[in-house]
Amino acid sequence: MMVSTSPTYAPYTDLRQVELVFDFGVVAPEAAQSAQATSSAQSSVSNLSQVTDDVEEMSGKYTTLEHNMWVLDGTMEFYPGSQVGWQSDPLSGDDGNFTSNPWLEFQFAANQDSYGFTLIFDNTQPNNYPKEVITTVYDLNGDQTGTLTTYPDGYMHVINLPSPDYRRVHFEFVGTNIPHRRVRVCGVRFGIQYSYNAKSISSVTIRQSVNPWAESLASAEVDATIDNSDQLYNMINPEGLYLYL
């Protein structure tokens, strides 16, 4: 039986919204699987093994006695939690500096190649990342093969330090962005990866074709134009990961 509908009835919307997200990067997953992690003193709730388990965020917004981390707004949770990452034991002082800088280190049984490194800090609290990171890599003989000092400006911190044939990488955290805080690292990538979403993609064209006789299956093609207003990509003199574009 047919159901009568009004002329204005529309079973399908005239406009569909589709959001595209894509990643571009060079990451060595086998490095995370074989890395042997050590660190400076860590807090009682810290879990060092979680920095290389591919889970790159905290499972909750946890309350502590650190500065402004016991906010009575109903959003905070109590420890323990399933995903807490690595947390340094000492807190920074009034000036945001440590008496002794906390650190993370990873050693490998075989040589590794990484185009760079990515540190993922706690994104449940605003500005909850270190002021400065000193990254140093070493070869099989313990000789330093590269070092770079960087200054995080967000929870996802990319370190452009190409490192071939290294056996050990050391991250030293110099101070916190907010005084009286710990350093929290949710994840470490042995490589660099950039993510593009609706905020960084200016246009997208999707092309699909169909063979009416089903003799072949054509591949769909996607052309995306990214927002390069921050000049990360320079066509004449590309640097960093964009050398691979």
Predicted feature residues:
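Assembly/oligomerization scaffold segments
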Residues: 1-245
